[in-house]
Amino acid sequence: MRLCLIPRNTGTPQRVLPPVVWSTPSRKKPVLSARNSMMFGHLSPMRIPHLRGKFNLQLPSLDEQVIPARLPKTEVRAEEPKEATEVKDQVETQEQEDNKRGPCSNGEAASTSRPLETQGNLTSSWYNPRPLEGNVHLKSLTEKNQTDKAQVHAVSFYSKGHGVASSHSPAGGILPFGRPDSLPTVLPAPVPGCSLWPEKAALKVLGKDYLPSSPGLLMVGEDMQPKDPAALGSSRSSPPKAAGHRSHKRKLSGPPLQLQPTPPLQLRWDRDEGPPPAKLPCLSPEALLVGQASQREGHLQQGNMHKNMRVLSRTSKFRRLRQLLRRRKKRRQGRCGGSRL
């Protein structure tokens, strides 16, 4: 026989072991209760309803072939319009005229290279209202510009944004490019507040024989360069603004105004001695007596107040002591009467 323990779970409190019953093991299967039937019992199969509707799927057939659309190729027209041919003819005629003239100096090269570029730009802007079809290469223009830039680099740098001025030139002393001046050229006066670097570059290019008309460079270069009559004439013909500006500077550079010294303070006493003492107001003897009497009365009143406070404090202390003694006596009498009873 085999013994096993079967615990009883009915009515067992917490933290208390259930009573043990010794009995023989039964071969019967344990009966599931109604509470545990949902957990351990067999689940009934779920029935899924059939779909009543029908779906027709349309698949593409394999016979049909998808042909991608081809983009139309844009035809490039290489034909040059009439406007481009006219530009080429003008450039060729200018080259022939330049070759007939022969080699020119540096100043003329700088003056002639600029109008070619401007004419090319003007023709391209005026005669091209719409973009040209095809590539039009103006080889002659580019070759000419490259040779001119290689020969005269310094002069072309200065002549890009400034005209060359002279005393005998029209339109305010500025010559148009392409016409060399017979007399020595003179640069214009600088605007106040601007740098003199372009004028120095022009001096290096033109040489030591030519002097600028600006007053600043004339003052600096008096010792280094000789005085020529042409240079003196050009300096006299300088604009009136620069002369006025120079005279204004001279006025400012004069001796400063001298301030008048302030006179010293007049003291009524000597410096070694200090100031005299302050004068007190004059009082009559009657007023002095009245003031002394009022001070005495004030002191007396303060003394009387202190005395009264002391007396009051003493009386209050004595009263409190008397009250305490009376209370103690009453307590003692009450205790003695209670013990006797």
UniProtKB/Swiss-Prot annotation:
**Compositionally biased region (Basic and acidic residues):** 72-101
Query: Which stretches does UniProt call biased (Basic residues)?
Result: 243-252
Secretion signal: which residues? none
Domain of life assignment: Eukaryota
A Pfam family annotated for this chain is: POM121
Q: List the protein's name.
A: Putative UPF0607 protein ENSP00000383144
Report residue spans for region: Disordered.
70-131, 218-279
Source organism of this protein record: Homo sapiens
- Which stretches does UniProt call biased (Polar residues)? 108-127
Question: Member of which family?
Answer: Belongs to the UPF0607 family.
